[in-house]
């Protein structure tokens, strides 16, 4: 299954046997290699009540690649950093809680992108890189072009005390270590893709 987010809503590419049949809000779109994704994007833009569109397919990976190719694809990476107390590093940007992340630079390994972006956005250095958690997909429009951002998320650990320094030029107003027991209100005020990272990491 692949989930492509449009802010808080999503297009879900899955097998016919998956969740579409049990979701009471399911809207199905039957996709072929000649299908155009733009009608789905336009549906999201014009209908604020539409939450999820399912694309059932017996060839999920092939269908996913066909969909991806209809956007301008960009790569990004970030991290779910944990300190020795078991707190998680989060940032506040545009009024919502988020995880530090950013775009991949030319020729840069994606894991290096993840470490660099977390350090730049929070001031935390000497992070230890762990395993890949998941990859999330998010669509956005820029200069009248639809982009599809693939974000690689990694486990990270930090063992030193540090004063957090939010990167204000990236509209980050706060960086904070959040205890696991305190996560629920933070995850309520974040993006669905960020909740997906915590779920994939088996934190919540």
Predicted regions and their residues:
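Conserved beta-strand and immediately adjacent loop positions that scaffold enzyme active sites
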Residues: 78, 87, 174
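N-terminal leader/capping segments at the start of a protein or of a new domain
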Residues: 1-46
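Acidic, metal-coordinating catalytic segment for phosphate/diphosphate chemistry
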Residues: 34-78
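Unchanged
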Residues: 104-192
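Nudix hydrolase/Nudix homology domain
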Residues: 4, 15-29, 96, 167-204
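Short hydrophobic/aromatic beta-strand or adjacent loop that forms the aromatic wall/cage
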Residues: 1, 76, 149-153
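Acidic surface patches and DE-rich sequence motifs
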Residues: 6, 83, 92, 141-142
